[in-house]
Amino acid sequence: MWENKVIYGLIGYGGMGRWHTEILSNVPEIEIGGIYDIKEEKRIEAKEKGFSVYGSEEEMLSDPDIDVVLIATPNDCHKPIAIRAMHAGKNVISEKPVTLSSSDLQEMVNVAKETGKFLTVHQNRRWDDDFLIIRKLVEEQKLGHVFRIESRVHGSRGIPGDWRKEKIHGGGMVLDWGVHLLDQILYLYGNRKIETVYASLTHITNQEVDDGFTTILTFEGGTEVLVEVGTNNYISLPRWYVLGEDGTAVIRDWQLNGEIIRKTGITEEKVVPVKTAAGLTKTMAPRREDTIVKEALPHVSGDIADFHRNVAAVIRDGAEPEIKLFQVMRVMKLMEAIFQSAETNQVIDYRQYET
């Protein structure tokens, strides 16, 4: 029945669990062997969708057909379920964030080494089209030397009305969206070390956990990266704003509206000043049209199903994993530094963590 397929057992059939089943329907090398959720109504829902359902976590972990346990539960549950699954002989995919601290992650890594099981994390935003466009621009030096990147996601509805509002479950925007945006930046600049971290958190709609944050990362070589998440923003700033010595790129929204503006090399011998309310300025005057060139953003398309295809290749063929545990640990330690900076209102010298 399962010949040549990698069989997943899914724990957690909430929003992300259902989303995983939709994605996996397009990955023929993987089959969902069954689903377990602690809530009976979720198990009933999964059964009505045609999935096999387990009556307990133990029943799933004792099923010899299951190769991989995919954990899509609240954040605080990831670590204990993953450890039990690996001890039961299962490979593990955890939803992000993998857990709530770097020490917890180290425990999970130790169990993976002890049991010889594959452990990875679903960092799916590496396949976002907007990120892939920015990565292409940076790698191809389309803007020359990039000296500043701004990465933002803004919403206006606060934190979703579930466990993400609660500290005990690992709620808050640093752990929810920050883990994505920080992973993208560290993946983009994988070989460059962070020198300093400064951050602030917001508590506009929630006093228990952060409902937004801003952090500024300074990388070796001087590149500065601003990462920001807001949930009480009724006018959103651009998703990406990238400044290079030879030009600027902007991606305004999820629909990939944006453009690139680069200098042509033509020198303005005489700058016409622009009139402002309180006087003239040449410094802030717009450039002459013949000194710049406007270009469309390149087309780059990602496929999130590639994450699961890679997992199947790792399990079946010993392929290199796309999401590596040292990368996950680096993101986790960076989030801890963000919390530390926000709590102390201090710039963190991050070089001690980048050895």
What are these regions (language model features)?
Residues 1-3, 68-70, 296-298, 306, ...:
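C-terminal helix-rich "cap/oligomerization" subdomain common to oxidoreductases
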Residues 107-124, 144-151:
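Rossmann-fold dehydrogenase core element
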Residues 125-206, 345:
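Predominantly a Rossmann-like dinucleotide-binding segment in NAD(P)-dependent oxidoreductases
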Residues 228-236:
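Glycine-rich phosphate/pyrophosphate-binding beta-alpha loops
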